[in-house]
Regions:
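A short, histidine- and acid-enriched strand-loop-helix "catalytic/donor-clamping" loop
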Residues: 117-131, 145
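Structural motif
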Residues: 3, 90-91
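Glycine-rich phosphate-binding loop signature in dinucleotide/nucleotide-binding domains
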Residues: 83-90
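A nucleotide-sugar donor-handling region in carbohydrate enzymes
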Residues: 36-38, 43, 143-193
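N-terminal subdomain of nucleotide-sugar transferases
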Residues: 1-39
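Membrane-proximal helix-turn-helix segments that form the acceptor-binding/catalytic region
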Residues: 133-146
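An aromatic- and histidine-rich active-site surface loop
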Residues: 93-111
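Conserved nucleotide-sugar phosphate-binding/catalytic loop shared by glycosyltransferases and other
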Residues: 29-75, 79
């Protein structure tokens, strides 16, 4: 059995990783799914998990008022280090380009644990736009063992960065899969917003 750690902290990350989490949970004989929320967006991420009938196994509560980017990064990396101390992890899955994504990728890389990057290959090629996300997604793709690109254009961007073709898979955008995971009741209640 493989122990798969999902690391996220924002609502968009939950939405785009929920279908992958739910799919792997269908195979408990193959995968032990560990769901870790850094709570970068505490209320929004936990509320969104509930829409999918999910709960985090580990809540890190890393956010404090008025933190600098360096302070956020330090808190998340330190908290994830403890997660790895307390859990055997065979692979880490992250999505997108947030501080949580970069920290999940780096913490795994430092322990030689494979990183799988969902929504890889999005690029502006301007390190200050979006800031700091452009650098975060480039660094995450660089250390990822597998990169799941939404489109062929994203695959081409990764190839231009000398990421090996056998580490890139064009899979579409998991936000579409997320729609199919939600109940009709949940979708109808969302119309109120």
């Amino acid at each position: 059995m493989k122990n798969i750690l999902f690391v996220f902290g924002t609502r968009p990350e939950v939405i785009k990783l929920a279908p992958v989490i739910l799919e792997l949970k269908k195979y408990p004989e193959k995968y032990n799914v560990i769901v870790c929320n850094t709570e970068q967006q505490k209320e929004l991420s936990n509320q969104t998990l509930a829409y999918f009938g999910l709960k985090a196994d580990i809540n890190l509560d890393c956010m404090k008022p008025n933190q600098s980017l360096l302070e956020v990064q330090t808190r998340i990396l330190t908290a994830l280090d403890k997660v790895f101390d307390n859990n055997k992890v065979d692979a880490t899955i992250v999505q997108g380009d947030t501080m949580t994504v970069l920290c999940g990728a780096l913490a795994s890389f430092y322990r030689k644990i494979p990183v799988y990057h969902v929504e890889a290959g999005l690029r502006s090629y301007d390190i200050y736009e979006p800031f700091p996300e452009e650098v975060m997604r480039q660094m995450t793709s660089r250390v990822a063992e597998l990169n799941f690109a939404p489109t062929e254009k994203n695959r081409q961007a990764l190839l231009k960065e000398n990421i090996s073709d056998d580490k890139i898979f064009v899979v579409g955008n998991t936000v579409i899969d997320a729609l199919f995971c939600l109940s009709e009741e949940t979708l109808n209640s969302a119309k109120e917003y």
